[in-house]
Amino acid sequence: MNGPRHDTSLFRERDVVPIRRALISVSDKTGLLDLAASLADAGVEIVSTGSTAQTIREAGHTVTDVASVTGFPESLDGRVKTLHPAIHSGLLADLRLASHEEQLKDLGIEPFELVVVNLYPFVETVASGAVDDDVVEQIDIGGPAMVRASAKNHANVAIVVSPADYAGLAAAVAAGGTTWGQRRELAARAFAHTAAYDGAVAAWFAGEAPDLSAVAERFEVRAEWGQPLRYGENAHQAAALYADPAGCGIAQASQHGGKEMSYNNYVDADAALRSAYDFAEPAVAIVKHANPCGIAVAGDIAEAHRKAHECDPVSAYGGVIAANRTVTLAMAETVRGIFTEVLIAPGYEPGALELLKTKKNLRILELPVGYARSLTEFRQISGGVLVQDTDRFDEFDSSGWTLVAGAEADAVTRADLEFTWKACRAVKSNAILLAKDGASVGVGMGQVNRVDSCTLAVSRAAERAVGAVAASDAFFPFADGPEILIAAGVAAIVQPGGSIRDEEVIASATAAGVTMYFTGERHFFH
């Protein structure tokens, strides 16, 4: 069955559409009263349902109930409210066609120029652990129908699905109406919104996330419009942020101050979080171009930041800082004196936040409660998508490491080796990381051979390499890499092992009296 076709020569020109009548039905009441006030001040008739109508009416604004428009009461515990020709004819009438206008008059139906709808909180209900029957009740039917009808008819109707668009809508109403371009952009967001919603429902019925241990028939990603970004990785690239409606990460973080986040800011901040949140202890990671230039743990977060910054102060200039604890006033006082692009943490002491806000360009982000990395990750390639389990340390335990050279590490050295192994995972391959006293002192990242990574790490550590420990994200194919580390004074090395020349590598460490452990697990990061 196909939709009707119209002779486009019959279409009348319609760009700016004044708002005279609006249909509002929202679950999320954020910004509702300000929007209703702006519409009422402009003389717009507001038609609404249930609790939305009650909220607007209690604020002192006149509201027309949907039931008085349809002549049919809300029924079946609210399951049927707006599913009626008196509503949908007003949403779908294409008033560029004289015939549609005449039919509305014959039917006694008034058109809508604005629809404001957000859907039942299905994802939030699932996340709350609700029983199946309660989850099913949060599958919206009438809402998506109104959204899709309005978006289809964007030539005549503006559809708004997010409180983030209320301010722009109010400005358009005050300016005399919405333009065709505005309505088309809103329609695109609306269809993305309903697609993500339906995808969430389908995923729930299918049993949530795909099991990657078997071949899944289909992999779906759900994301909703978040915000436009000034540009992408470079100024000539367009970019935007889309957020997982069920996510609890950087895309959902609150910003307390500073300039707008950029594409590169988000990439670096996410990389910094990946580094800092590998540790149970207070930890700070400083990142530049998605690579750590300092990672450290300590008894308190301010000391962790001091140690992380000391690793490479030159590279830390203009970097992104992530902390896995509440930022204290002591840490804020130090950060305030360093040019930093982004600071992200789970919280801020009141005094710390006020101090940081004096840095007008510093982007201050606060993670949502319950921050967690996704269990799966994907990367787009030409013609498809790669999907994998996220690389993470589950119940980290070094007792399974194998001592292959030198003496057993004492408790202090063992703790440093464990720290170094975790920290190295956050470095782009080929990765070598030197550390001492719970802090990185030299990082060799992103080199195309492990010898160059060793050389880079040692050169950055300089005299701090003496007595330090080292980690390699993958095995050493030859003894030349460890020999560079040993010559610089490294006392212990941890690596996966698995090279066909492991015996040569082990012999080199043994001859130098250097402790070496094999973990049996690689941590490439590309």
Swiss-Prot record:
Pfam families linked: AICARFT_IMPCHas, MGS
Stated name of the protein: Bifunctional purine biosynthesis protein PurH
Catalysed reaction, written as an equation: (6R)-10-formyltetrahydrofolate + 5-amino-1-(5-phospho-beta-D-ribosyl)imidazole-4-carboxamide = 5-formamido-1-(5-phospho-D-ribosyl)imidazole-4-carboxamide + (6S)-5,6,7,8-tetrahydrofolate; IMP + H2O = 5-formamido-1-(5-phospho-D-ribosyl)imidazole-4-carboxamide
Gene: purH
CDD domains: IMPCH (cd01421)
Domain MGS-like positions: 15-161
BP GO annotations: 'de novo' IMP biosynthetic process
Domain notes: The IMP cyclohydrolase activity resides in the N-terminal region.
